[in-house]
A protein has these predicted regions:
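Polytopic transmembrane helical bundles with strong interfacial aromatic enrichment
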Residues: 1-416, 647-650, 654, 661, ...
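Hydrophobic core of alpha-helical transmembrane segments in multi-pass integral membrane proteins
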Residues: 31-43, 168-173, 193, 375-376, ...
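Early transmembrane hairpin module of multi-pass membrane proteins
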Residues: 63, 69-71, 77, 112, ...
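Juxtamembrane membrane-water interface segments of multi-pass membrane proteins
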Residues: 84-109, 232-253, 274-283, 307-333, ...
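Interfacial helix-loop-helix junctions of multi-pass membrane proteins
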Residues: 132, 203-214, 271-291, 470-482, ...
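Functional transmembrane alpha-helices
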Residues: 200-205, 209-242, 272-275, 290-305, ...
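Hydrophobic transmembrane alpha-helical segments that form the core helix bundle
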Residues: 266, 527-617
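Membrane-interface transmembrane-helix boundary segments in multi-pass integral membrane proteins
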Residues: 284-296, 361-368, 417-425, 564, ...
């Protein structure tokens, strides 16, 4: 699906069925109607819309907020889905060398603009109605605007929603103002940022399982919005889409995205369900029944997607062949050829039209299922789960700080037996391993080779990353400073080395075919990012070294570390930043992927040694420090195992000691690469000499001979008569016997 159809999007096929205008008109109303029906039934059946005894917000809160949330979620999906299709599925222009904007690409941006405007307005409505629902009857007692202002400036829930509204508004402005590929991609990134904040609101920070709940909810939202949003976007541009000659390629690309989204939705949904549903009896509660119904709808949606891939996509036109014009010759053969071409064209159009008709029917069916599933998602958010996401009645000090249960006292074995799976990094590591292996398989299937040691290195690096983010180092990293330092050192100094040796960008360039229709897939976007001036700046050896070493000082001595411990977003950003810092530094020293401005080997070694020496001094400074780093956190954990200052000194020892092994490893790898590079250069020079037959040496000798002849000049007393042929041949023969030997001093002059 990475390779595009050879026909340009401007070339029109003929797979229209007459149903496309009805699909475009009916898609959104059908989605809303089914959603309203399913949502109403769910709210009534679960009792979520029933009045409460205390602090009832009235019909405005009980019914208005779910309606606003349904509109909010739908507009969010449509905005992000349409932008994603414009960025990675559709070509921006009608041809690679054309400046004319593709009509469907333009329509997608129109869909995104309308959806983003609705999303912005609905976010304001959700903010206000969330205040009404939270305040209850008191919302309308006193000054409404003043109380609302206090809610969004003093209460955490209101502050988060204010940030969400601001991000959505900024994203909407970018959607309306930017039209380039890079601009639309930037609008997509900004529009996706509210998902992080929405995932935080879905679970109490003080309740157990906060990391798993927030991570799984963020993955769930990402999967739903790109799946549902892409589907609705295709329906809204149905008439123009069916006339395209590259319809099959477009649908295949979206189908791949939908398959990935389906896997994300199923994994995250099951993870979240297991956190909120305990035993078998919990599945019979109102929450459990709605959850089972939503799961059944998701399975049906997966079956519809499987039907697309099995029975539809292969029959859609990638490029509909035009009837062949008759060639010159007798009238009878020309007529036969014209008739055969007409019959073939008619059969092709009939097959394409039948596949398109089935495709749009399945799309409408999926929209119906998605409408019900989206509404039931709102119902679940309004229904109390069997396992409440509320803080325990008597929380421990660590539960108050982190929202997690204090693990048992650490031992060497428990660092490998205690696990806390972060769904975000589970998806990243497992997904990166699967995609890498699929790329290697694609190379092998077409007869190309890929070094096995690079595959092993990549998988080893991902295994280290998986342990660092989900294993014992992560479990104890928020309890003990020493465990945090172990996690940090493995993240920034150990995991990046095998990941860099895996050469993922090189594999991507070889494994994925470039697109020919002007659209940008994964290959094009990765290469654009790798060769961008921002990537070149941060991957510059000096900048990478400063970032690698300087980030330690800024992170540990500026107070930023508190946010990485206290907030989920801060924790994820910490992992992402230090992994990137270590990766850029290792890439500048031992990497082979393109896009990095690497210094010669003799310069890289001093950069490595200076950087690691600074790192050693950093560890010594922590060992000798008498002030607690992040003392408000590590000083109040309350584990009673070891004093915080002693544990911090142990962390300094880890920072100082563990850095020696990666440094030695980097130096050895650098020396090996240096030797291999010199060997390859010598062999290349030898092959060049073998091909030229010592032409360079012969040219040099000829130059010396010419200089010698010029220095000798004409013979003394010469009358200008030419030298005899015999003498000239003899002289040339003597010179040719030793052209590389210069004339000796004191040699007798030529005879007169």
């Amino acid at each position: 699906v990475s390779a595009s159809a050879k026909a340009t999007p401007a070339t029109r096929g003929d797979a229209t069925t007459g149903i496309e205008p009805q699909v475009r008109i009916a898609a959104v109303p059908l989605f809303v109607l089914i959603g309203a029906l399913a949502g109403s039934i769910g709210l009534i059946a679960t009792g979520a819309a029933a009045p409460t005894v205390l602090a009832d917000s009235g019909p405005l809160g009980r019914w208005g907020l779910p309606i606003a949330e349904f509109v909010f979620n739908s507009a969010m999906a449509l905005t992000i889905g349409s932008l994603l299709l414009a960025v990675v599925v559709f070509p921006r222009t009608t041809g690679r060398k054309s400046s004319r904007i593709d009509p469907e690409w333009n329509r997608l941006l129109g869909v995104a603009q309308v959806a983003s405007a609705v999303w912005t307005l609905s976010s304001v409505a959700v903010l206000v109605l969330t205040y009404v629902d939270t305040a209850g009857a008191q919302a309308f007692q006193g000054e409404f605007s003043g109380q609302l202002w206090s809610f969004i400036t003093e209460i955490d829930l209101g502050r988060v929603w204010l940030a969400i509204v601001g991000l959505i508004a900024v994203g909407s402005m970018l959607v309306f103002g930017l039209r380039s590929f890079a601009g639309v991609a930037a609008a997509l990134v900004v529009s996706a940022l509210p998902i992080l904040l929405l995932s935080i609101l879905g679970h109490s920070a003080e309740a157990d399982g906060h990391i798993e709940a927030v991570g799984s909810l963020s993955i769930h939202l990402v999967g739903v919005v790109i799946w549902l949003g892409g589907l609705l976007s295709l329906a809204l541009i149905a008439p123009g889409l069916t006339r395209r000659a590259d319809l099959g390629s477009i649908v295949a690309r979206y189908s791949t995205i939908a398959l990935i989204a389906y896997a994300l939705v199923m994994y995250s949904g099951l993870t979240n369900a297991l956190l909120r549903v305990g035993g078998i009896d919990d599945w019979l509660t109102p929450y459990g029944v709605v959850l089972v119904t939503k799961l059944a709808l998701t399975i049906l949606l997966g079956f519809a997607g499987w039907s697309h891939r099995r029975a539809v996509i292969g029959r859609l036109p990638g490029a509909v062949p035009a009837p062949t014009a008759p060639r010159t010759g007798s009238d009878a053969p020309a007529a036969n050829r014209e008739g055969a071409a007409s019959r073939a064209g008619a059969a092709s159009r009939a097959t394409a039209s039948g596949a398109a008709l089935l495709f749009w029917r399945l799309v409408l069916g999926e929209i119906v299922l998605f409408g019900a599933a989206t509404a039931l998602g709102v119902v679940l958010s309004r229904t109390a789960p069997p396992v409440p996401d509320e803080p325990p009645a008597e929380p421990t000090a660590f539960q108050i700080l982190s929202g997690e249960t204090l693990p048992p006292e650490p031992t060497a074995a428990r660092y490998f037996t205690e696990w806390l799976f972060d769904p975000i990094w589970v998806v990243i590591t497992v997904g990166a391993a699967v995609l890498y292996l699929l790329a290697v398989k694609r190379l092998r299937d077409r007869g190309d080779s890929w070094p096995i040691h690079r595959t092993i290195c990549w998988l080893l690096g991902l295994a280290v990353l998986f342990y660092v983010t989900c294993g014992g180092a992560s479990v104890y990293g928020r309890v003990l400073f020493s465990a945090h330092m172990l996690q940090h050192m493995a993240l920034v100094m150990i995991a990046p080395i095998p990941l860099v040796l895996g050469a993922p960008v090189t594999l991507l360039m070889r494994g994925l075919a470039p697109r020919r229709d002007g659209s940008r897939g994964v290959r094009e976007w990765v290469l654009a990012i790798v060769h961008s001036r921002y990537a070149r700046f941060f991957s510059h050896p000096i900048v990478a070294a400063i970032n690698f070493a300087g980030s330690l000082i800024v992170f540990y001595y500026s107070g930023i570390m508190w946010y990485a411990l206290d907030t989920h977003i801060g924790h994820e950003l910490m992992i992402l930043h230090f992994l990137a810092a270590g990766y850029f530094f290792a890439q500048s020293i031992i990497g082979v992927d393109p896009g990095v401005n690497r210094y010669p080997y003799p310069v890289r070694l001093p950069i490595l040694l200076v950087t690691m020496a600074f790192h050693a001094f950093f560890g010594i400074s922590i060992m000798s420090s008498t002030a607690l780093i992040a003392g408000d956190w590590y000083g109040n954990v309350g584990h009673g195992w070891v004093s915080a200052i002693e544990d911090q000194a142990r962390g300094g020892e880890i920072a100082w000691g563990i850095g020696e092994f990666p440094t030695l490893g980097l130096a050895i790898i650098l020396a090996v690469e240096w030797f291999q590079s010199s060997t390859r250069e010598a062999k290349r020079s030898d092959r060049a000499e073998d091909r030229s037959g010592d032409a360079e040496l012969e040219a040099y000798n000829a130059m010396l001979a010419g200089l010698a002849a010029a220095n000798e000049g004409p013979p003394k007393g010469s009358t200008g008569a030419p030298v005899g042929n015999g003498e000239r041949s003899k002289e040339n023969g003597e010179r040719s016997t030793d052209r590389s030997r210069p004339p000796q001093a004191g040699s007798p002059p030529a005879e007169e």
